[in-house]
Amino acid sequence: MGQAAKVLQLFKTLHRTRQQVFKNDARALEAARKKINEEFKCNKTETSPKKIEELIKIGSDVELILRTSVIQGIHTDHNTLKLVPRKDLLIENVPYCDAPTQKQ
């Protein structure tokens, strides 16, 4: 896949992720849209293949962090937040026992 196609695919992926992560939050959706568009416009004239690959890597990392680390919180009362996790964030919780087992 050519670099132009990779850049376009990353641009679309970032916007899709933005829509999922900040669903029902108009301010966050707009701020993320502006930031994504601004960053792509700033680097629009970049011609170095090495630098473009580096920027693609950074964009991919940002998308991964948004998708796997950001959780929405909704103000319900004074000093109270309701967390709204997405399925991407829910992972299997493996029980952990930190008490040492006794040798017999």
UniProtKB/Swiss-Prot annotation:
Source organism superkingdom: Eukaryota
Keyword Chaperone: yes
Subcellular location: Mitochondrion matrix
One Gene Ontology term, aspect cellular component: mitochondrial matrix
Residue positions, PTM Phosphoserine: 60
One Pfam family hit: Complex1_LYR
Biological process terms in GO annotation: mitochondrial respiratory chain complex III assembly
A GO term for molecular function: protein folding chaperone
Keyword terms: Chaperone, Mitochondrion, Phosphoprotein
Parts of the chain that traverse the membrane: none
InterPro entries on file: Complex1_LYR_dom (IPR008011), Complex1_LYR_LYRM7 (IPR045298), MZM1/LYRM7 (IPR050435)
Function text: Assembly factor required for Rieske Fe-S protein UQCRFS1 incorporation into the cytochrome b-c1 (CIII) complex. Functions as a chaperone, binding to this subunit within the mitochondrial matrix and stabilizing it prior to its translocation and insertion into the late CIII dimeric intermediate within the mitochondrial inner membrane.
PANTHER family: COMPLEX III ASSEMBLY FACTOR LYRM7
Known partners and oligomeric status: Interacts with UQCRFS1.
Annotated family: Belongs to the complex I LYR family.
The name this protein goes by in its record: Complex III assembly factor LYRM7
This protein's encoding gene: LYRM7
